[in-house]
Structure formats: structure tokens, C-alpha cells
Amino acid sequence: MSNYAIILAAGKGTRMKSDLPKVMHKVSGITMLEHVFRSVQAIEPSKIVTVIGHKAELVRDVLGDKSEFVMQTEQLGTGHAVMMAEEELATSKGHTLVIAGDTPLITGESLKNLIGFHVNHKNVATILTADAANPFGYGRIIRNSDDEVTKIVEQKDANDFEQQVKEINTGTYVFDNQSLFEALKDINTNNAQGEYYLTDVIGIFKEAGKKVGAYKLRDFDESLGVNDRVALATAEKVMRHRIARQHMVNGVTVVNPDSAYIDIDVEIGEESVIEPNVTLKGQTKIGKGTLLTNGSYLVDAQVGNDVTITNSMVEESIISDGVTVGPYAHIRPGTSLAKGVHIGNFVEVKGSQIGENTKAGHLTYIGNAEVGCDVNFGAGTITVNYDGQNKFKTEIGSNVFIGSNSTLIAPLEIGDNALTAAGSTITDNVPIDSIAIGRGRQVNKEGYANKKPHHPSQK
């Protein structure tokens, strides 16, 4: 039989105190909704229906055509939300997973096990449960003397005995699809919240003598529902440890997982070393044998093998094998560093292509430039690429020596094997094999210094 999934993503998330819908808040680089969607793929659903409401278009844009969508205009409870999927699913035969879009830590493995348990036990409904050290706020799983599930009681409706129960409802279920939509016709709002509880269908099934079961998670963390910024930070911490552990299993050294911030889609090759306080975001990819030292921050960067990045920032750039960057360098979007390039301390490179074995050791700005191989930038070199309105390009050939404190005013071309004298302001193109000198001639005025206040004769 087919599997289906309903993802509940209509809520505003008032306690988040945010303009964003709750499920749009990110954990380790992607939205909570995307985490849930990825995990749901493990059950190989024939159809996924996402229930949307608050700022629906934002939520719809995240999943695009990978899901069907239904609107819940009024948020009248979880049961009401599932009712919205009736037109999409009610006549289908199979098993339907119902899961909240704010549970980013649930794993695909657990959902697959839940479906398997449901099918093997021939249940009409199976509840995903967990044991909570502090169950306050959760619905409680009430069992009879034969350990069978009899009902789920919400916190506000629980009596003193029921509030002592540690087994909680995670808010994730599997149902026989047609039985689910039949039972939803019989639920009402006679409860403390005045809402349609999805949990009420469990009681309906029990009264009808249908089989209801519960599959208990081994790891309570997976059950975490994010309702506020505190829980969001908790989810982030758990996910970070999970991600770091997987990289370590794959052969990466993560010196201190507590301080490594690695987004879920980041790729890292074997034998690479991630020192403390490193942040790797977005679609960053790191090759083999690369060292990222304390404080490095990479966003959507493509980094090759045997690279060393020392306490530097790299954004949306390509760094080839054997490159060294930093300390305190900034590689800005649109930059490409070829093999063997060295970008040293306090160097900024923006929107530039730098050829093999070129070196900019210190205190340099290279912007909107195309640079050949084996070029040396002296300290203090500046490409002047902006006139206040437009950006201009600097083109530098191969085997060029740029003297210290050179100012290169674009648009400008410097030919192969050329040299600029230290302290020069270069405004015109420099031909191949030429030396360009663009500075005032030094004049020494002998004896003038003894008239100045600093001179010993004046003290």
C-alpha cells in the first residue's frame, strides 16, 4: 500500500515574536520545514500535502512543486488542520504520516521505523511517543493494565494522575488513511482549548474497537517541537552536534564540536581539520587535507584540497588546491583563487580571478581584477576600481611585480613581466616588459632640518 504524508505548517508561532512563520526559522542552514520534509522522504510517500496558513506564500516558496498545498485560513487546532487535506487524500488507500513542520530533529530513520511498526502491527493508528524527563506541556500517553494505549490527554485537560505520566505524545502519527478522515468527522471542540484535537481520533478508534499502538523514540531530542527562540537554540545545538559527529565519522577532525557551526549541506573531505570557532554555512564544500583555523567563517565557498585558511572570511568564492589564506583576510563574492595562491594578512579580494602562484602577502585590496600567474603584490597595493558611480576592471598579466604602496587606477592593463615602482600611482596602461614609475622625484634640501623644532640645535 502507498504511504502519504501531511505536514502541518500553517501556524504563526506567536511565541517566536517574529514576522516569519514559525516553520520558516532556520536550524543549521535550512528552515525547520525543510528538515521535516527531508526526513519525510525516508518513507517514500506517493504524495505530500503541506497545510499552510500564515504567510502561506513564503512557506509555499520553500517547497515549490515538491509538495501539494492546502490552506488552513483559521487555525482551529491540529484536527482541523488535517481536515484541510481531505480533498487531496480522503479517498486514497494506504498509510498517512501526520507530522508538525516545527520538529526539525526528527530523523528519516525514525519515521521509517514508525511506518514499519504501524504496518507490522496492523494498527489503524500509531502514535510516535517519547519518555520526557519533564513532560509539562505535552500530551500524555495513557495506557491500560495490558500496556495498551487508551487515549492521549492534553496538558490542560489532564488530571493529577495523568500529569505524572512521563510518556508523551510527540505530535507525529501514522494512520490508516481512510479511517483517519472518517474519524475526523466525529471530533468536536469540547475541550479546554476550544479546538479540534487530532488526538481525539485515538479515542474514537478505541471506542470502535480498532487497534491503536505507540512506537517510542529512543532519543527524546528527536521529539523537540520548536515554539520559541529558546527551543530554536536547543534544536540548533543538537543539530550541530549531530552534523559534527557525522563529519568526524567520515574522517574529518573537528577539534571542538561544541564550537563548530557547520550547516547541514556543508561537505568536508577526509583528513581536513576544523579548529574551534569555525563557521561553515550554506553550500560550502571543503576538499581533503584542508585546515580551517580558529575564527574562520565561510559562506557558500568552494575550497579545494590541502588549503589553509587562517582566521579569515570567504564568501561565495572558489579556492583551488594548495592555496593559503590569512590571517585576517577577506575573500569576497565572485573571487577565484587558482592553485598555489597566497593571500596574506589584512588582504581583501573581491570579484577577482587570481592566477596560479600569485602572492598578495599583506595590506592589499584587489577588486574587480583579472590577475595572471606568478604575480607579486607588494604591501599596501590598492586597485582603485570605483569612481563613485561605476566599477572598473584591472587586468594584470603574468610574472608581474607590483611594488609596495602602488595605487592602480582602473580601468588599467599591466602587461606580462612588467614592474611598478614602489609608491607609484599608475593611471595608464603598462606595456609588456616595462617598468612604470608614477611618483614625484625625491628632492633633498641640505641643512633645512636644523631649522625645525625637533632638531637638537633648537632645544
UniProtKB/Swiss-Prot annotation:
Offer a single GO CC term for the protein: membrane
* Binding-site positions, UDP-N-acetyl-alpha-D-glucosamine: 8-11, 22, 72, 77-78, 139, 154, 169, 227, 332, 350, 365, 376
Residues holding Mg(2+): 102, 227
| Amino-acid positions noted as binding acetyl-CoA in the UniProt annotation, renumbered to this chain | 379, 385-386, 404, 422, 439
The family this protein is said to belong to: In the N-terminal section; belongs to the N-acetylglucosamine-1-phosphate uridyltransferase family. In the C-terminal section; belongs to the transferase hexapeptide repeat family.
Under which EC number(s) is this enzyme classified?
2.7.7.23, 2.3.1.157
Superkingdom field: Bacteria
Output this protein's name: Bifunctional protein GlmU
Q: SUPFAM superfamilies annotated for this entry? A: Nucleotide-diphospho-sugar transferases, Trimeric LpxA-like enzymes
User: Subunit notes for this chain?
Assistant: Homotrimer.
| Top EC class for this record | transferase
In this chain, the stretch annotated as Linker covers 230-250
Question: Gene3D superfamilies, alphabetically?
Answer: Hexapeptide repeat proteins, Spore Coat Polysaccharide Biosynthesis Protein SpsA, Chain A
Which InterPro entries does this one have?
Bifunctional_GlmU (IPR005882), GlmU-like (IPR050065), GlmU_C_LbH (IPR038009), Hexapep (IPR001451), NTP_transferase_dom (IPR005835), Nucleotide-diphossugar_trans (IPR029044), Trimer_LpxA-like_sf (IPR011004)
Q: Name one GO molecular function term.
A: magnesium ion binding
Query: Which NCBIfam families does the UniProt entry name for this protein?
Result: glmU, PRK14354.1
Q: What does this protein do?
A: Catalyzes the last two sequential reactions in the de novo biosynthetic pathway for UDP-N-acetylglucosamine (UDP-GlcNAc). The C-terminal domain catalyzes the transfer of acetyl group from acetyl coenzyme A to glucosamine-1-phosphate (GlcN-1-P) to produce N-acetylglucosamine-1-phosphate (GlcNAc-1-P), which is converted into UDP-GlcNAc by the transfer of uridine 5-monophosphate (from uridine 5-triphosphate), a reaction catalyzed by the N-terminal domain.
Q: Which residues form the active site?
A: 362 (proton acceptor)
